[in-house]
């Protein structure tokens, strides 16, 4: 059957989401043919669809910086290449499906409770209460006689303790403590809601017309009609009249019914195996069958491996007491030394003693040996998200890495599609000064004037200033390329330019790999001795040591007559302890016992002497955020972040200066062949003869700055890398000068919108709190090695050094001749983002083009400016509770709080004992007269 004509093209589909970036292709070998003349500029092409972005490569290890290469010889200028063809626009991709919803993780077990905190400081005395109202005046008493002074009364008993007052108002908030250590990664969040259904795709093209069916058989003949009756005889034949008008075309007859079904055709070919079906649901469990008969015993299995040693049996019942034996013969005097007795079991811990009276600080103790480094604690729960820190200053440009080894030449890939029209190149060097123009025509001679009287010669005038520069001559013809001259001496460094304006805060770079530990710094001053840690429990009993060597034999006793078997003698008194045997090898370390009760914190003693440097401690918790270091190598690209809100369109910024050209990038791997049918190869054109070099062209105008790409979406925050071993304190380096900005890369491809990310890592650690006042002196702990101490709190960050002044910008030297192409260098750092251009007018919608070949993936553009922070994701389930932290140092006495509200009146106190009789008071005023 012949396929029908192709139907009209459907409406243009909606644009699909951008694909993942494709791998970077290798650079092909240069062609052998001569380079043709540069063609005229074609019309501006339409932007093709974004190609699929490649998977991010693994960042390579940073090699040591190589030596600086020698300056190459100047090469001859090459001829411009031919303009490439415009690529076909690709079809829109289909919309991707949303991934499955994640399973919520299990809830962690609650951690153990932490140790009791240190005893708080005694609160400051509250303000005095208000004065009560004055009582009514008493009646005037009669003047009493002066009494004698009575004996001094006994001291009254101490009154009961008053009711505890209401708590005062909260005092001012103390300084923020240091931020907690970064918690472990939370459990995966709950499954997200199903995404909205995708936009319906464009309608497909109409299918080709199917083949015509077979013609049905003819129907049976109809019945024969009846014969007509003979008609009446006709009249004479008339004259033929004129032909009538043509009648209308009759309607199409009804479609005939289909014929009978034809015979079945031959059996078709056997189909291939079908795809694997989905597993069916679990069937309903059937009824349990009757128990089967017991099988015959199987053959004896191989002999098993010997089992583990059994536990010691329980102690047997004590035996009957034996008969008292007769006293034995006296042993040698002195007897042999007995074995050292085993140490007794540790006694139960004593009751916790009451805190003693706060003693005076003891004398300054000798510097103790540094304790063993404690084991690294389990990461605590995630701390609260700190405030967003300010963007750090852009780090100095790192030294260029060494050139990588030359890669093996890859297989020649398929012919790629013609690339897009490149951006206009930078302005060429200024042309050579042209020859002076012809002199103008001589003017008409004027009338001779009258000769004046010659005056006296005047004094010599000052030297005239340089005249105005003449007009620029026409560019002269370019001479033949001369031989490269010898390498000139390196010029002197130009003067230091003026300090530039401070640049904008750069985007914080990805965390680079942990570098090797720096050189050991000078030992710092020994810090003040911290509070004594709690005394560890008595260690478990060690294994008994080896038996000591037997002592020398004693003198032999007199041989007595063999006595009869006497009764067993009474138990003798324990003998004297024998001589101590040689020290046996140390037994295995016993298990660490449970921590004992925490004693009261002792008063800090005086500052100890400067101790020797201890062994390197275990890995501490991450310190506070340091200064932004030089940018590390590119890390693995994180998953695409959620789409940020559309930013406001900013005004047109000032035109930036063109930065120096970056080093050419490394050759990437060859890209995969693109989709689509392979086009037929075109006919090779005849090679043109190399033309003579044309005249030096006038330097072209500077190209229009391209529109910057859309603002990139903020990616997920990377997982915090493992904390490396702390490097030794190295000497502070001198602040380097700020490097020149790199060239602006092409705009990067926008990634597909990702799912909402997990909660970001905790913020930087806050500044440490103020030192607390010394607590009361605690009880003296037991001697002996204590358990390993907890890791100390991170130290405060050191002061930031002064930023180095930017050097004065040197004057631009004359452009030298172009040198030969050097080896491909490492890719330079991303340049600053250019100003956002004006939004162009929307062009007319073009016709749908034929699906083109897959284009090469473009170079990765500079990272977009960070988008606005998206909404916080749902908080995950609480992680496992971390181990108890170490007791912090007691804080300083806080400021006196605000006076609290007046509490309710307390209970009435006991009436005090009668005090001593006081001295007689002064005579009162006379009373009023009595009634008559």
UniProtKB/Swiss-Prot annotation:
Glycans are attached at residues 83, 851. Residues 1-932 are annotated as: Disordered. Expressed in bone. The modification 5-hydroxylysine is found at residues 83, 224, 288, 496, 607, 777, 839, 851. One of its GO terms (cellular component) is extracellular region. The modification 4-hydroxyproline is found at residues 15, 18, 21, 30, 44, 59, 65, 74, 80, 110, 128, 137, 140, 167, 170, 182, 188, 197, 203, 206, 221, 230, 233, 243, 258, 264, 273, 279, 297, 306, 312, 318, 327, 330, 334, 343, 349, 361, 370, 379, 382, 400, 418, 424, 430, 436, 448, 457, 469, 475, 484, 502, 517, 523, 544, 550, 553, 562, 568, 586, 595, 604, 616, 622, 631, 640, 643, 664, 673, 681, 690, 708, 717, 720, 726, 741, 747, 753, 762, 768, 788, 791, 794, 863, 866, 884, 899, 905, 920, 923, 926, 929, 932. It is found in: Secreted; Secreted, Extracellular space; Secreted, Extracellular space, Extracellular matrix. Residues 1-21, 127-139, 585-597, 740-750, 785-800, 917-932 have a biased composition (Pro residues). Contains mostly 4-hydroxyproline. Proline residues at the third position of the tripeptide repeating unit (G-X-Y) are hydroxylated in some or all of the chains. Contains 3-hydroxyproline at a few sites. This modification occurs on the first proline residue in the sequence motif Gly-Pro-Hyp, where Hyp is 4-hydroxyproline. Residues 110-125, 173-212, 351-370, 412-441, 529-543, 556-583, 612-628, 657-666, 678-690, 752-767, 821-835, 856-899 have a biased composition (Low complexity). InterPro entries: Collagen (IPR008160), Collagen_Structural_Proteins (IPR050938). The modification 3-hydroxyproline is found at residues 630, 904, 919, 922, 925. Keywords: Extinct organism protein, Extracellular matrix, Glycoprotein, Hydroxylation, Phosphoprotein, Secreted. The modification Phosphoserine is found at residues 89, 532. Signal peptide: none annotated. Residues 47-61, 836-850 have a biased composition (Basic and acidic residues). Pfam families: Collagen. Residues 268-277 have a biased composition (Gly residues). These protein fragments were extracted from an ancient tibia bone collected in Haiti. PANTHER family: COLLAGEN ALPHA-1(XXIII) CHAIN (PTHR37456:SF4), SI:CH211-266K2.1 (PTHR37456). Trimers of one alpha 2(I) and two alpha 1(I) chains. Type I collagen is a member of group I collagen (fibrillar forming collagen). Belongs to the fibrillar collagen family. This is Collagen alpha-1(I) chain. It comes from Neocnus dousman.
